[in-house]
Amino acid sequence: MTHEEILTLLGDYVDYLIANSSAEAPMWNIEKVRSGKPNKWNYIDGCMITACLSLYKTTGDEKYLSFSRDFIDFFVQEDGSIRTYDPKEYNLDNVNQGKNLFTLYDIFGDEKYRRAIDTIRSQLLTQPRTKEGNFWHKDIYPWQVWLDGTYMAQPFYMEYETRYNKMQGCIDSYKQFMNIKKHMRDEKTGLYYHGYDESRQMYWADPVTGCSPNFWLRAMGWFMVAMVDVLERMDEQLYNEYRGIMAQLRQTIEDVHKFQDEETGMFWQVMDHPGVEGNYLETSGTALFAYAVLKGVRLGYLPKRMAAWAEKAFYGTCDRYLSKNPDGSLQLDGICLVAGLGGKDHRDGSLAYYFSEPVVCNDAKGVGPLVLAYTEMIARK
């Protein structure tokens, strides 16, 4: 396919997904589809609604805004409570969808969105923390920091503190990124480990460093986008902190680029083991890289020369994994369904573990980031 054909196909693909989805039954949430359980407020839908709202902002097409509002309104009540969401679960994943409430509040001015924003914020006020001050990823994972959690919570946290709390928590957010750099960055590769256990008690944690054993692509992707999204919401008056996160972002992109597959432009599921049996070129993390870089270049956080790396990743992913079925339906493959650390399934962070998780099509953890990258590609035209 030509680049123009790919962009057209992606537009059709998004329309196909929203035409076949609702808040009760989003076809892109494969975990929910497989479980057969009713849908809940969750980060996976949050990724897709963020992408739809970004499409609205870029194209002006009202159908994306209308779909997003209807989806969110299924959960958000007039008093600001959110159906199926419990702040006391202390799960950072559940904060992600909250970013979209700011957008809807700005557009529609409905106070229920403002109240729901405070509902989400109430979780972060009492979210358990490590001794150094980082949010625990979940209450059920004590003392643990995962890269995923930076994307799930920090952009919301930074936006709330900047808008409504006189920037009181902004330096706290910055310090959490610096703690992650101190503990989770590998000096040799520049990559960041998926998880860190401050207590050093988990079976997956290195007894000296507390880190998990490997560099999972999607976790790195979440982390890169988190830095871009936090910078976007951060006041430049915080001179040292703003430039500190920008420097961390630039260095991370430089380091990650070294692991980009030369032929396809994609990245491997476990980043530093290319071609190892069981490893594969993975869609979601590659798309997150493309989005982070394209957005970072557009907003001036990254040098323009990096955009070529992102475009190669974007088109490489589409060439390899985006296709049209004989019945006319569209499909995006190569998406790791899920990966975590600990829990009842003994997720030990090994190569074998990351290679064992299901690879699926049309899941929002891959679709959402690719559509976000697509909106950046449109903006470059």
What is the role of each PLM region?
Residues 59, 108, 160-171, 230-243, ...:
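Inter-helical turn/loop segments and adjacent helix faces that build the functional surface
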Residues 51, 58, 100, 107, ...:
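Core register positions within helices of long alpha-helical scaffolds
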Residues 7-26, 66-83, 115-134, 167-203, ...:
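Long, well-ordered core segments of solenoidal/helical folds
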Residues 2-44, 63-65, 74-92, 96-98, ...:
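CBM-like carbohydrate-recognition segments
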Residues 76-83, 134-139, 199-213, 268-278, ...:
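Acidic/His metal-coordination segments adjacent to aromatic residues that form catalytic metal sites
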Residues 148-163:
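Acidic/serine-rich, low-complexity amphipathic helices located in mid- to C-terminal regulatory regions
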Residues 224-274, 278:
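Oxyanion-binding "anion nests"
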